[in-house]
Amino acid sequence: MYKKTASVLILSTILLAACSKEEPKAALDCAQPATLQNIRTTIEDTLKQQARSFARNDNRQFVDADKIIAAGLELETLLEDPKETEDNGKAICRANLKIRIPDTILKTAIDNSPLIYGNTPLSDMLEQKLMGSNLIFENNTFSTTLLYTPDKDGKPVFEDNTLSSTAQTLSATLLPYGVKSIVMIDGKPVSKEQAIKLLQNQNTEEPPTV
């Protein structure tokens, strides 16, 4: 009787020990194609919203929103070194986001910036927006770090607003690219080059806040 009872107790202990062991969690798939596609969609949607909002509110009508939207399709967006890491005991994905603006697009934005940002150079505007953030702009490229967790469909759930703030800064950078070739100054059509010269020599109308 004792041996039988002891055997039952031993078996129960083994079963309980087996049940109490936690099954190892599956590794996060941080490099799913859906992640990069989601990022690109977020950027393109933000560009579209910001460009249309500015064009709608600017009574000077200097900007063609469609030009900015088209420029967004030419951006080179990369997600580098995606890997699983841990944040406060939670398994998450970490990756480096890089968004490169083509040379011709950035040059046009810089040239047109006086019609949008007045006497503030595009580089100074960017410096103000980057201050205090983990976003870097160098060699035509925005760089930052994203933290996210893939959902059951592989789409990323981001841990903070880094992506949205990056997209907004990118939108502000590309906004001057959308300046029309011919704009209206004092009711007269002039080339954007002439408009820049005119506006640099006088106080410009305050543009909508970007």
Predicted regions and their residues:
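Short amphipathic alpha-helical "recognition" segments used for binding
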Residues: 7-8, 210
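C-terminal motif of bacterial Sec signal peptides marking the signal peptidase cleavage site
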Residues: 16-18
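Bacterial N-terminal signal peptides
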Residues: 8-14
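Cystatin/cathelin-like cysteine-protease inhibitor module
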Residues: 20-210
